[in-house]
């Protein structure tokens, strides 16, 4: 599952709302928050929000990648994680890539855009010798893991919050959901994602399986374990709240549609390959979305923010 955008805002209105929101957040938290645009004429993409620690020197820097459809402002409303990271001495960056909030995360365009923003941040703030961390929510977590697999500048540690990892599984489960929706309207997220996955993979799993192996951060059916072998020495945490009864009741979904299927399989294979620093953390009844605090296990809130930060700061 991924988070889908509910609406679109014009570029100028989005810029005004973003700056206003950041102003409110900066005053509420007493932290300096800056919005940086790589393209001054486009406020919807190729930009990043940066939250500064109160004092120097930094203890490192961290990229927190939003879920599908999320702006930096949405992230700051949903979770205190960026604020707490900055309070603990980490220069904190929330990027928006070339495709804007509709970034697919694991595709080459998103990964190239990530590298462009990373280079801009590291050069402006002289961070070459600093510890670097990366993580994200949903497809933002997929993006973080994909980056760690292929990057030249390796992060000291990676975290991901309920990310979809195996897009062959995602594609097949979405197709199955539509097939089972005989007397009900199909989930529009699945309808969209089937088309989007086919576009990004240049085909279906039957016609372009090699592309699914190449682009997915993890592939259950790839016996060669191509992608994850690059993570054998990488400290990695994946969070998930596998509330199967909620998914059955609220979404008519089962384990084949849940991201924890990918997450648990990937962690298991990494452990068997010798990575004892790869851990799956499961939670119960922690998933709630702000501002209305409604129940949803696929949420930022499943993470114990302070404990995650403590773990990151222990990494070398």
Predicted regions span which residues?
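Short amphipathic alpha-helix adjacent to the substrate-entry channel of hydrolases
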Residues: 74-93
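Alpha/beta-hydrolase fold nucleophile elbow
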Residues: 126-138
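Hydrolase active-site cap/lid region
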Residues: 109, 148-210
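C-terminal catalytic histidine-bearing segment of alpha/beta-hydrolase fold enzymes
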Residues: 104, 236-248, 257-316
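Glycine-rich nucleophile elbow surrounding the catalytic serine of serine-hydrolase chemistry
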Residues: 136-146
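Short beta-strand element of the alpha/beta-hydrolase
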Residues: 58-68
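A domain-start/cap signature at the N-terminus of enzymes
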Residues: 29-60
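Alpha/beta-hydrolase active-site loop
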Residues: 105-125
